[in-house]
Amino acid sequence: MNIFYVHKDPVVAAKMLIDKHVVKMIIESAQMLSTAHRLLDGEQYEDRTKAGRRIKRWRLKSKNEEAIIYKASHVKHPSTVWVMTSAYNYFWLYKHMIALNDEFMLRYNHTIPHMTIRKLKEILKYPPKNISLSTIQTDPTPAMPDECKIPGDVVGSYRKYYVMKKKEMASWKAPSQPPQWYTEGVENG
């Protein structure tokens, strides 16, 4: 679970992500947005996992939403907490998720959106009813090793994280290309 905040603009950030993250982060973004709905607007109850363990869950009042929105996941993860802090943060991630899908369709030559987008685009378009509208947008909390963090610079931290820790899996399918900051970071080692 993460938000690869490599640019403050959610669309530009999506274009800069490596191929693997373009696909994977559509699902993770939808999980965080869904979790925001469940925790902020849902009613908590106790359930059991398939293995019989007790687990906290949140039920939505709307049967339509309950049937469609993903289950709550990683409820204490810094990225999930960030999404739930304000409507502005929520909208940033929603726009990023849509841009990731556009990038997915472009890079992989798909004419049909990712399954997650087909299922959740409309229902996640609006933030939870109980999310703060008065809290301004903030940068996400960096979720990465300390050695990658640059104090006071979340974008720089995520870029450094990409250069230091994601090199082995870094690829950009044409027509996309690695961002300049990435190629310079790898060259300068």
Stretches with model-predicted labels:
Residues 1-76, 80-189:
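Sequence termini and other peripheral, non-core segments
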